[in-house]
Amino acid sequence: EEDWTVLVPYWAMWPFETLLLPRRQIDHLDALTEREQLALAQVLTRLLRGYNTLFDASCPYTMGWHGAPDSAPAPHWQLHAHCYPPLLRSASVRKHMVGYEMLSEAQRDLTPEAAAQKLRQAL
């Protein structure tokens, strides 16, 4: 996809957490061109269907967008989204952040690189 990048960041706390980024500097969602909006719809559809394929079920997720804090131009800001599916190895094995993970460091069942490879195969 030439307008968007989806990646599993090396700092991911959730096993199949992804970061969605436009390939050009954009500070607000309303700055997307029509082409980028259509491409975003396609990328999101592919990503969410990939999660469903990976877990062989309708996969729940939480998604949030980070744009510049106000409508003023913000060339130092990069619009991006985070997608967090709370599943580990199957639709019946959920990830729960507790104790140590909430206060210190996330525990991973697989590396971000392994998660990215599995997700790539599901796409």
Question: PLM features: what roles do these ranges have?
Answer:
Residues 1-123:
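HIT superfamily nucleotide-processing domains
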